Curated annotation (Swiss-Prot):
HAMAP family according to UniProt: XPRTase
This protein's UniProt keywords: Cytoplasm, Glycosyltransferase, Purine salvage, Transferase
Residue numbers binding 5-phospho-alpha-D-ribose 1-diphosphate: 128-132
Compartment(s) where it occurs, according to its Swiss-Prot or TrEMBL record: Cytoplasm
One CC-aspect GO term: cytoplasm
Protein name: Xanthine phosphoribosyltransferase
SUPFAM superfamilies associated with the record: PRTase-like
Organism encoding this protein: Pseudomonas fluorescens (strain SBW25)
Amino acid sequence: MEALHKKIREEGIVLSDQVLKVDAFLNHQIDPALMKLIGDEFAALFKDSGITKIVTIEASGIAPAIMTGLNLGVPVIFARKQQSLTLTENLLSATVYSFTKKTESTVAISPRHLTSSDRVLVIDDFLANGKASQALISIIKQAGATVAGLGIVIEKSFQGGRAELDAQGYRVESLARVKSLAGGVVTFIE
């Protein structure tokens, strides 16, 4: 997606050979016009997949997930990282390790919102080692729902997440596939 590539080149900051900072437009400050384009693109890619729900993890996946849900006309569910007083019933949950935060947390969704009749699209901001995606897939499977595909805003292709998801037979659509961050330069797989 050229608009996303341009934004990454202009506003993304390479912190290391492993870390790309995109807080100027995606995971701290959000560019609504770019999120609309991202939602349009994911909706076009998955329009014939019978999606009934979108699932993401709070917080950075919420903006692209909402725009995709708006386009597809389906609800968006975000897995919560912190349990609240209102989220108390037998939760669907999984443990996820954050590559950038170097922490492990439990994410959860209420079973009231995800059922065995759902065809679910996972939307996330990044795909690196695939831990967040695998956690969401686990939650979807606990509900007996079907994973219809995964929409990733930025994929770090040099890490193993994509290969693992491909090996499991999941459809993965990434809008920006980063080949390398070596030397402080973002190189894309075109």
